[in-house]
């Protein structure tokens, strides 16, 4: 039995906390929202994010950062990318011993263009850092929490951290593979959110399967081009952290990124769509980061560029589709 603190009380953090508790581990969740903490401790639910799920009664929650830090030596960082550096810095300020960090965020930091493991590494003093890893792949929280068969990848620069992650989470409904390509697994998880928003737009407009298939295929090509430029193994993008995550996020209404895109394709404004969803949509922030990163690295990413224009320059979605279709002739 291992003690684990889960930082973040969103849908995926909650679903994975439930996995860990059912695997026999002691789990403490930390969140800022006292109402959510009280609900979990009293009712064993988190209805804002997982409306119908009843959670393991052994999971406890707190809003006390010091208590959360002292509880365990392994931390599951289940926070939005934009909050990761701030919370990791707060944790670091209170640490007195080494901790292992496993994150499940899928984004790239605006401005620095850093992957999430790099953000954590920046924020945690070396004397307190026992290793950093990621758990990623095609894994909707809504399915994990009701024990639908799910398969993901664990990756780290330290093989011991990858193996630890595999051992902690794997059970009869959650299969975990290890993968040595941390860069590729993190980039696959982040970049697919861009394509998922675009895929939602295509569905919202009402285009058919041909367009959806083309978008995912050419989207994967963009992901691979940038990934290879940044040091990833291109083969990683044919695995769970790449095409696996891409498929599930581009084809399901469980996906916040797809849902946002669908609403935009239906004619809603971004502000209107986000107010209805009331959740963090990582693809917005990732699109902004990757648009500028691709220009810096001189990588051709036409779908990302088109989505950036829709999200940040108020170009109509149909105009962007037209521009994509009328690009210069090229070989595949």
Swiss-Prot record:
GO cellular component labels: cytosol
Known EC number: 1.1.1.94
UniProtKB keywords: Cytoplasm, Lipid biosynthesis, Lipid metabolism, NAD, NADP, Nucleotide-binding, Oxidoreductase, Phospholipid biosynthesis, Phospholipid metabolism
Residues annotated as the enzyme's active site: 192 (proton acceptor)
InterPro entries reported in the protein's UniProt record: 6-PGluconate_DH-like_C_sf, 6PGD_dom2, G3P_DH_NAD-dep, G3P_DH_NAD-dep_C, G3P_DH_NAD-dep_N, NAD(P)-bd_dom_sf
Keyword Transferase: no
Presence of the UniProt keyword Glycosyltransferase in the record: no
Residues reported to bind sn-glycerol 3-phosphate: 106, 137, 139, 192, 245, 255-257
Intracellular or extracellular location(s): Cytoplasm
Subcellular location, principal: cytoplasm
Disulfide partners: none
GO molecular function: glycerol-3-phosphate dehydrogenase [NAD(P)+] activity; NAD binding
A Pfam family this chain is assigned to: NAD_Gly3P_dh_N
Binding residue positions for NADPH: 11-12, 32, 106, 141, 256, 280, 282
Pathways involved: Membrane lipid metabolism; glycerophospholipid metabolism
Reactions this protein catalyses: sn-glycerol 3-phosphate + NAD(+) = dihydroxyacetone phosphate + NADH + H(+); sn-glycerol 3-phosphate + NADP(+) = dihydroxyacetone phosphate + NADPH + H(+)
Function field: Catalyzes the reduction of the glycolytic intermediate dihydroxyacetone phosphate (DHAP) to sn-glycerol 3-phosphate (G3P), the key precursor for phospholipid synthesis.
Protein name per its UniProtKB record: Glycerol-3-phosphate dehydrogenase [NAD(P)+]
